[in-house]
């Protein structure tokens, strides 16, 4: 498995040249798809997502993608500048907007992420935060806004619907199926306190996990829906990896 967080055009190198010569990895993290999904959530627009999917690098038939929404690492905005322009944006200000949206700098954003590895000279950075907190569930629960809670849950389901239907292997990060929020426990540990990625690497909350069996809870609503979607994925052969980039709109 290649956990290579590189430019879209570089990832195919980790698969090797062909099935015989320079055979490398059989599976690679689809970091580009992940970044494109987060772009669509922030912009409320699928233009860059559609463009980026069409231009994902070709891969060998023997290889496949590991598709995910969140993982243990930060979110890097690793989509291609040419795709950003084809979607109607300018690369630098567009990436700045995405970063600001998820780190609380954009007015009205419900996201509760933090910048990671920020370069003070260029303004470039990556994004830390749990899935639920980045889509606004933490903010919605704090305010008790039922409409916002519904919207956040629907976004969590929507994001997973893409990785469960896109060719490859879907990966669900621990805690995402019950809407795990950011944790600040890491700040009490001097060995990791300076690394805010630990806000989405918290200990699994088994007490909260029990609420997935209680009808109407946030945990139950997310977990039961994802469970149904996974079952559908298993029984639908059309979701296998046929390397088909045609988008039906």
Language model region names:
Residues 1-249:
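Active-site and adjacent substrate-binding regions of carbohydrate-active enzymes
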């Amino acid at each position: 498995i290649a956990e290579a967080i590189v430019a879209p055009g570089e990832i195919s190198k980790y698969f090797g040249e062909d099935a015989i010569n320079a055979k490398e990895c059989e599976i690679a993290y689809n970091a580009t798809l992940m970044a494109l999904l987060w772009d669509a959530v922030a912009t409320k627009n699928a233009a860059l997502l559609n463009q980026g999917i069409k231009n994902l690098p070709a891969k060998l038939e023997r290889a496949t993608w590991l598709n995910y929404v969140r993982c243990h690492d930060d979110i890097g905005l690793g989509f291609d500048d040419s795709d950003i322009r084809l979607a109607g944006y300018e690369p630098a200000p567009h990436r700045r907007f995405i970063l600001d949206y998820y780190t609380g700098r954009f007015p009205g954003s419900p996201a509760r992420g933090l910048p990671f590895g920020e370069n003070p000279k260029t303004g470039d950075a990556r994004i830390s935060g749990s899935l639920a907190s980045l889509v606004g569930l933490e903010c919605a629960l704090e305010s008790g806004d039922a409409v916002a809670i519904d919207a956040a849950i629907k976004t969590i389901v929507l994001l997973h619907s893409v990785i469960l239907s896109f060719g490859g292997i879907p990966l669900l990060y621990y805690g995402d199926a019950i809407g795990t929020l950011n944790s600040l426990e890491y700040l009490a540990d001097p060995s990791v306190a300076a690394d805010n990625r630990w806000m989405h690497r918290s200990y699994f909350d088994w007490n909260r996990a029990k609420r997935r069996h209680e009808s109407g809870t946030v945990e139950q609503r997310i977990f039961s829906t994802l469970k149904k979607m996974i079952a559908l994925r298993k029984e639908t052969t059309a979701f296998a990896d046929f390397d088909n980039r045609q988008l039906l709109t």
